[in-house]
Design a protein with these regions (language model features):
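Conserved beta-strand->loop/alpha-helix structural units within folded catalytic cores of enzymes
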Residues: 214-215
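Membrane-anchoring alpha-helices and their flanking helix-loop junctions
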Residues: 1-196, 218-290
């Protein structure tokens, strides 16, 4: 199946003709594996190395430190993709995007791995000892803490969580099919003169459907796990994404489009659907006009 915008995307990678483009897929895969391994290690490293009072003191912070480090580095690399634009264009011209894409394809997989990480318990590899009571408390579902294990609760949360997972994935696939890999791959951040203004109706209800998808994907994990850790991880992810959207991407859009984009910001929410627009959004997912 041919991906929309693939030709335009590939056109801006002049040193990677034909199958050489697979380098970027391998780079993303390696980045994701490294990020995942780091998170798994940080989830249990203090439980593995420490004991006694030191275990009780430091173990609860291991998973949080792991998420914080990967999130910081991931968003930093994505920021560098935007930050280095002018210098790279001046120095490399038509190869600027190709050079910058390396930053994005290391950073973005780490952000995606953070979302996947929310779906899994922190003791998946290294068990929590009986004396590590704070870590155990943070990793248990909130309902389990108060009412014990309840099959109905687990079932309802799982159904809703997997529904959100489906909505997030479906939103990404719909966005990709409509706008193409060239837009999703941020080619026109570097070459805006080649782009076309997008007028799809989805932009009348939400400014950043892709980021909405990422929020929804991660929220599905929160409902499935429903632990204090999952809520903390989700909060950290929201903060990182919002800082990036508001102070990196939208700053660039304001420079490009000026007051017209500021007016658009006032009329349409960035990543949260208004209740009145839920029906329209579902039509978008089902490939129907509003």
């Amino acid at each position: 199946m041919k991906i929309k915008g693939m030709d335009k995307f590939h056109e801006h990678l002049p040193d990677y003709p034909g199958k050489k483009i697979r380098f970027f897929a391998r780079l993303s895969a390696i980045s994701a594996i490294v990020g995942l391994l780091f998170l798994v290690v940080m989830d249990g490293v203090f439980r593995l190395l420490l004991s006694g009072d030191l275990l009780i003191l430091f173990s609860p912070f291991g998973p949080i430190f792991g998420v914080g480090i990967i999130e910081f580095l991931g968003f930093l690399l994505v920021y560098l993709f935007w930050k280095k634009k002018d210098k790279l264009l001046e120095k490399l011209a038509n190869k600027a995007y190709q050079k910058a894409l390396v930053y994005a394809l290391i950073g973005i997989p780490w952000i995606i791995i953070l979302m996947i990480h929310i779906y899994f318990p922190i003791d998946l590899i290294i068990p929590i000892s009986s004396m590590d009571s704070i870590t155990k408390l943070l990793s248990r579902s909130i309902t389990e803490i108060f009412v014990g294990v309840n099959i109905l609760d687990i079932t309802i949360r799982s159904i809703f969580g997997f529904f959100l997972l489906f909505v997030g994935l479906r939103t990404i696939f719909r966005t990709l099919s409509i706008f193409g890999l060239d837009y999703m791959g941020l080619v026109y951040v570097y070459y805006p003169e080649e782009s076309e203004v997008q007028h799809h109706e989805i932009y009348s209800i939400i400014r950043h459907p892709t980021y909405f998808a990422l929020f929804t994907l991660a929220l599905g994990g929160v409902f499935i796990r429903f632990s204090l850790y999952s809520i903390i991880f989700y909060g950290m992810l929201i903060c990182g994404l919002m800082i990036h959207v508001l102070y990196v991407e939208e700053k660039e859009l304001i420079i490009r489009f000026g007051d017209s984009y500021r007016d658009y910001q006032k009329k349409v929410p960035a990543i949260l659907l208004r209740p009145k627009d839920i029906g329209k959004f579902m039509k978008f997912l089902l490939e129907r006009s509003f």
